[in-house]
């Protein structure tokens, strides 16, 4: 389960509910959205109830099954509660207005969607432009890479993306191969080769956006957390096109990750082997193997109590780069878990964003 916040739920966190003795309500992950469906267990018919460009985070039904309260995420605003009335017209309306005052006090853009061709796939991507965007100017680019790996970005309001856009960055985020929501073959494309073809997809997306003419190719930055941190490490060890990078709660050594993470054993399903039987395979797909090729200035952010991606992953990478006299900085957050960015102590969550902005601004 991926913690909700700046990422679309990819493993269905909402339990399916019976509306009647025959009709089952459920959500799925589909191309950046999280639609709500009704399934009739007798006829096998599937009926969409909510299938627009939005995400049903969770829902609750009235006793008679005629009304459904929906926790809905949209790109235009932070989440609110909506009411779906299953009368003859299927009326859907918002019933909370928790963020209206806040939204009226800020200036932000809605992300623009792109479908970018890459190796054997078309990659759904979004670009969030700064407020007051001027197409004649050249802006710095920030590539954001999601975790998972089998997760997805989508149709939600991302506070983190808005922070960077407000600071003057064009923010690019994509669902490369390995993401969920596009079928089994798409999600399984990285099986046995974690960084590929995701690397090609990410670079294709950057190339595509650069061709649009409003990004400065000399001012490109990259960041990501968890698997996104793994990919950040991989990207900067295989290209020098980025001026700076921030890797968060990341993985650099798959062999040690297998033995120290609370879910490390799950790598066997992806690599069809274990590190003590096939050390070369795990070494091949570990970014630290290629650390000598890293020249991009790197800031490593990690939580000391991270059980998913233990802090030793950050320490390994930091020591290796420091030993090689590479430009690297390590920032550790005490008492925090893998979910610092989404559920950490509020002042530390703010400090994390400030650190990232500082890191990118210094180099821009």
Language-model regions: role of each:
Residues 32-37, 76-83:
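Structural motif
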Residues 24-25, 68-69:
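Hydrophobic beta-strand positions that form the internal "hydrophobic ladder"
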Residues 29-31, 73, 176:
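Short loop/turn segments immediately following the C-termini of beta-strands
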